[in-house]
């Protein structure tokens, strides 16, 4: 009788743990409520004008849609100094407002970013060795404009190596649109475009920026660079999430 009771309790506990895990996965697709924050009222136009006067930006035009982008050299790399705005299937306007695209760019799923079939949101590209090797080419383009490509973790890390270790991304964040203004020391001009879950929830607009890496992380995840008002990190997220894209120039 005692043994049966122990077995019963063990089964119940296992069910509770599994249910909690499933619930946790569901909740991870919802935006957590946050307390209201004091806003930084520095106008976007003032930030942009200051940067245009301070930094030696290059520029190029994407032949696909006529969009023109600023570029900036940081160390030995040349980066787009704006988020990609190219409208493709599997891309979304930040906070679900098309009026945000001009400033914040668009949000893309990982497979859209890499310009590969959507089935790879849930499975590794290793099942197709030709695609697996193609993506790992140094200058694999993906959805980037011609002459640019989706950065790898190594390229993101090379960019971050230029930062003060204690800056927590402040040197990359713009002076506008963040609660805690960045110093934007390199003219990279990161704006908090937020992100989108695959269930349609748009999250953290005005509070967070996330950028894709082309590198896979497990079977259904990929790496991303994330900046908040006080942190910066590279971690894995669901490939079905929609994030911003910054492209780096081919070498």
Outline where the language-model segments fall:
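Hydrophobic single-pass membrane-insertion segments
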Residues: 23-32
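Prokaryotic Sec-type signal peptides and long signal-anchor helices
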Residues: 9-12, 25, 192
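Hydrophobic membrane-insertion alpha-helices, especially the h-region
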Residues: 12-19
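Conserved positions within compact, well-structured domain cores
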Residues: 37-251
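Feature marks short, highly hydrophobic, charge-poor N-terminal signal-anchor/signal peptide-like helices
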Residues: 1-10
